[in-house]
């Protein structure tokens, strides 16, 4: 996750 960006991986 990066700055709340958690796609699927």
Swiss-Prot record:
Claim: Secreted is one of the keywords in the record: yes
Organism the protein comes from: Conus miliaris
UniProt tissue specificity: Expressed by the venom duct.
Site (Non-basic residue surely responsible of very weak activity): 8
Name of the featured protein: Conopressin-M2
Subcellular location: Secreted
Keyword tags: Amidation, Disulfide bond, G-protein coupled receptor impairing toxin, Secreted, Toxin
S-S bridge residues: 1-6
């Amino acid at each position: 996750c990066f700055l709340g960006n958690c796609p699927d991986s």
